[in-house]
Amino acid sequence: MASQRFVIALHSFPGKSSDELPLVEGRKYLLIKMDEEFGDGWWEGEDEQGNRGIFPASHVELISDERSDSSDSRRGKEDFSISTAEVTRSSLSSSRSTSSRSDKDSEKLYSNNSLSSSHSSILNGPLDSLSKPSVPSNFNSMFPSSKQEGPSPLLDNQPSSDLSNFNTIDADYNNASASTSAPATSASLKKVLSAEDSVRETITDIETALQNMSTSASRTPNDSSPLPYIENRPASSLAVSEKIQNVPNWSTEEVVEWLMNAGLGSVAPNFAENEITGEILLGLDSNVLKELNITSFGKRFEVLRKIQQLKDSYEQSLYEEYPQFAEPISVSQSSDSSSSIPKKSNDEAGGSPSKSSPTRPGFNDYVNRPTSVMPSLSNMIVSPDLDSSPSTDWNQYVIPPLATPSSRNSKSTQSAVPENVSRFDSNEPSATSPILKRSSPTDSISQNSGLPSRLTEPISSPSTSSIDVDKEGTSFPGLPYHSSKGNLYAPQPSSNVPTKFTGGASESSSVPPRPIPSAMKGKAPASAISIEALEELDPPKITTIDGESPSSISSRLPSSNLEQGSSSSVTKSPESMPDPSAKASSPVTSKGVSINEKSAVNNYATPLSKPQPKDTKGSKLGNTFVAPSPAASLPASPPVGTELKTRPTLRSVASSPLNKEPIGKRKSKRDIFGRQKVLPTGISEGLSNIPAKEAIKTADCHGWMRKRSDRYGVWKSRYFVLKGTRLSYYHSLNDASEKGLIDMTSHRVTKTDDIVLSGGKTAIKLIPPAPGAAKAAVMFTPPKVHYFTCENNEELHRWSSAFLKATVERDMSVPVLTTSRMPTISLSKAKELRTRPPSLLIDDENEANLTSSIGLKKNAKQKNKKSSKQK
């Protein structure tokens, strides 16, 4: 029977409904269920009469258990899917089976002694002695790890205080077992048996804890080994662990088997019907379980709880199998691996060689496995911490090139990682710690050597492989971005090209520092870097002005581009390298850079640019930029008119101060073909350069008014000139050109007294025609609503009348367009006929054929009129 928990009512609670249990203050109630499932603060309990119901948890207090059964409670906590007790028992049994016969005999002797000692301690000793955990003196012989050569790792890791506690427990246990007891009665024997069970359970718990501690201690005997030792793990434990690690690859049958073992056999057919695999199982949620026809909320909650336990065990098994997989993994190089990077000998480094770490055949497959938990090896930056030991020779380290996984790049790159990389366990930096800390600007220069403690560019020889980029063009964190598609201006320098570089601390580079290998001493100058490092640097940008020679352009280059090598290092071809003897005689500019070096800066060409014809009189140079190329160098003072090739970039084009478009004008689409035809807008075309004093001579109406601005609603005073439907305004009478224009064609003129708009004054509101209206005409200004106010009512009346006349009056020079199809005649001809319009359609020949009475009456009247005129 499981443990029973009781509560005492702190406050009285009257049950308001049938499912609520009334509480009386001070009484004790049996607790059946807490709110683990719902979390609403309502518990379920039972009173002394057997009535069940729910009650608020805030009204009761949980008291100690009256009756407990440790075996049942422990059995209820274990999980069917991941039986940790089974793993522990199997590992314990296998470890005991490997022990010698003497160990087995000692275990039997220990069990007999424990039984007799428990009897004696219960009969003669106090009951509180049962709570003390009893550990035998020969407990070291129970574990195979203690039989290894040298001291036990468990005892080595334990402090002296813990060992003294074990000795005290051992002494108490021996004292208790030494005493003898008299024959007990049947009642006392029952108590002895129950107490004996509790003692055995306590000893079992201690053995399990010690076994787990010894297993974890023996798992990593060597700090330099990246993989855990698993030789001491039994076969059954390995099988369970491997099955848990293979959860994403479970089939539907394995998922159903797991459900049956987990006590969820009622929903197993639903999973089998929908073909739920292990990968889908790890991603299930409550909504998906509803789709699987699991209608009960309690059943869905239980399934989700089991799945969460499976996820936790899956992650725990991965950590136990590969405890350092989330950290930089150091793989020792094999003896047959070829590498062009030399290593420093052990005598030179002053340390002992690191032990080779054990490897498993399937570990590489596990690393390449597509999982979200396993990080990519290419994203791990492994580098010794140079700040931890300032006096250490910084040339002893060798930094190999990083490489992408083989699954992402078809090219297999030889990769090497330092062997002395430790784990991230310690917070304190060590000599082998791979943690790279950000150094302050004051720490950028070493105190002893005066050299920069961290260089800003990775160092590699031309024979080593450079940094790879995948097909999508993405690079690794901390490295300069380099696109593999669409990069039409990629530099292609030849190999083994010496490079001019002046060492210095960088200020803008985000690449992790890499020290220079000691093997490169003597082969190249101290300031030489490889061409792979320069390929990732952007070239310096140069902006030229009309009539400026390239030599003067070079003088305006920032000295940091050539002296620091941070973001614009210069690569020279063998032909362009200045002679060391002639270096002293070359002129030096104010920036400290010689003309020969500056001429080499201009020694670049774009592969896709067209050659431009030379102009002896001088050419017009626009915004030009430099791109590296293995072309020949220019002379020290190149002739005027040499057109520099361009390498356009978004950053350089955006920062160009030249070739700005004029305000109010837009370019045609045909400009991309080189026609350079500028099309003016309607406003810029309509504005005229007539002075205000000249415009008022031919104006229909002119004067000062206040116009409300469109953006902020501010009333600004302007001088307006109206001529026809063209309303222009000036800022003052001294303006030489119009400042604004309003086309009043087909506008409506109204008056408004809005307090918000005009502050209580009467304002003239000029409304444009609605889109699609019959009176809508072509206007050269945007159709906006305009508001005007005047100083007095007379001016307001004068301007409103002028606006009405301009909008109503029709231009007689423009023909009137109509949609009517009725034939019309001129006004002069209509006056001559003096007849009604219908008579124009009647011919003399058709007068006799008219049969209509109305037509006969009209004809008779016309005849009478003609006869009367003749008389």
Curated annotation (Swiss-Prot):
Return one GO MF term: lipid binding
**Compositionally biased region (Polar residues):** 131-168, 384-395, 404-451, 492-511, 561-574, 583-606
Residue ranges under compositional bias (Basic and acidic residues)?
62-80
According to UniProt, the name of this protein is: Protein pob1
**Localization per record:** Cytoplasm; Membrane
What do the Gene Ontology cellular component annotations say? Answer: cell cortex of cell tip; cell division site; cell tip; cytosol; early endosome; medial cortex; membrane; recycling endosome
| Low complexity biased stretches | 88-100, 109-124, 329-343, 456-467, 549-560
